[in-house]
């Protein structure tokens, strides 16, 4: 029975993604973001359970990618599409229809996520580190943007800025930038300095900014990875 636990958790990830899409259809952007975050938790737990129970299977790997595509590819893409579409109705740049194409920038996230997951499945070197931004991290960043409202109001409510984020995040997904994986094989300081440092930064940001810290945590993850790579040369 225990061998089915990782796949069960993966299915929970998938269900969260589907519920998030349903929430978007009903016009509930914030609840849909919560479903993305819940999917992130299940995505972490299924991998953790598989390593803890020493379970690995081709079906589990494929199921994980399919679930991730829904929760961290399709859902954030539709989330950006609906958000930018809604903002265009209340901004001056929508007057002549010149920027009517902006919402479709969100769909780049789905395409880039599919490519990212396909590359990851074929690349056996991505165990202790990742090449490009992981899809869960990207989805978490995208759907947490509204919580930056109090800090960067004009930025959060700019359709053009959000479209640019779609393009940049899509490029990061398919980039070959080395980013550390948050996978603990043990809990020794010497083997996990960067992971413990990142967790400390994340806790501090959450304590200060609360939910607004989530996009900042993803940015710090990228910055910390780049910093370690730079100073390790």
Which stretches of residues belong to each language-model region?
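Multi-pass membrane catalytic core of lipid/isoprenoid biosynthesis enzymes
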Residues: 6-10, 52-118
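C-terminal membrane-associated helical module and adjoining short loops/tails
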Residues: 127-233
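Helix-coil boundary and interhelical linker segments in multi-pass alpha-helical membrane proteins
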Residues: 19-34, 77-104, 145-162, 208-211
């Amino acid at each position: 029975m225990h061998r089915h636990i990782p796949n069960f958790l993966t299915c929970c990830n998938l269900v969260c993604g589907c519920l998030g899409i349903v929430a978007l259809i009903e016009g509930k952007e914030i609840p849909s973001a919560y479903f993305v975050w819940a999917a992130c938790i299940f995505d972490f737990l299924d991998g953790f359970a598989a390593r803890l129970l020493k379970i690995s299977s081709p079906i589990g790997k494929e199921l994980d990618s399919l679930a991730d595509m829904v929760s961290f590819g399709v859902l954030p893409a539709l989330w950006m599409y609906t958000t930018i579409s809604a903002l265009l109705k209340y901004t001056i740049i929508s007057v002549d229809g010149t920027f009517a194409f902006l919402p479709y920038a969100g769909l780049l996230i789905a395409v880039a996520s599919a490519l990212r997951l396909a590359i990851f499945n074929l690349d056996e070197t991505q165990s202790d580190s990742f090449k490009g931004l992981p899809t869960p991290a990207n989805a978490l960043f995208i759907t947490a943007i509204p919580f930056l409202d109090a800090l960067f109001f004009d930025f959060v409510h700019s359709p053009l800025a959000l479209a640019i984020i779609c393009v940049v995040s899509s490029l990061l997904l398919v980039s070959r930038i080395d980013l550390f994986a948050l996978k603990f094989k043990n809990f020794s300081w010497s083997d996990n300095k960067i992971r413990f440092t990142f967790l400390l930064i994340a806790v501090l940001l959450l304590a200060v900014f609360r939910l607004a810290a989530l996009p900042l945590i993803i940015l710090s993850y990228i910055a910390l990875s780049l910093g370690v790579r730079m100073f390790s040369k």
